[in-house]
């Protein structure tokens, strides 16, 4: 266990699923495709039902691990049916996040992509009727 290596912590962060007025979002933290696969399996087995989680209803996803190649699999995007994705990454970061592979998967699923490196702060506002609006604040 190399806790001095920053990569050690990848895949060990919180995942938050939120539902408000019928609009749901998942915040994947620094999680990878391994966690995505586990979440899909647990959802299919009904293990998330006790918490009121319905991953298949997820419309908004904050992609995992800043959009690295090891997150946001095509299978996960298909499972979620997300229409909006937020990628949190620094401008000209040394890791090349988000990767072209991840962006290609998002575009293949016709997901509306918002990126903090390009768009600045991204805000999603959900109204009382369940509708939502995504906007950027530079």
Regions found by a protein language model. Give the residues of each.
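Core dinuclear metal-dependent hydrolase active-site scaffold
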Residues: 1-60, 118-138
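Cap/insert and terminal regions of metallo-dependent hydrolase folds
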Residues: 36-120
């Amino acid at each position: 266990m190399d806790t001095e290596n920053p990569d050690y912590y990848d895949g060990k962060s919180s995942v938050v699923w939120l539902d408000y007025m019928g609009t749901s979002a998942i915040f994947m933290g620094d999680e990878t495709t391994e966690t995505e696969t586990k979440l899909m399996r647990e959802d299919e087995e009904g293990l998330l039902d006790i918490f009121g989680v319905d991953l298949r209803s997820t419309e908004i996803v904050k992609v995992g691990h800043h959009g690295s190649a090891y997150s946001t699999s095509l299978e996960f995007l298909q499972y979620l049916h997300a229409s909006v994705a937020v990628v949190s990454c620094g401008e000209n970061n040394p890791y090349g996040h988000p990767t072209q592979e991840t962006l290609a998967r998002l575009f293949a699923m016709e997901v509306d992509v918002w990126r903090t490196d390009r768009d600045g702060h991204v805000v999603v506002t959900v109204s009382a009727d369940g509708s939502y609006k995504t906007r950027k604040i530079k």
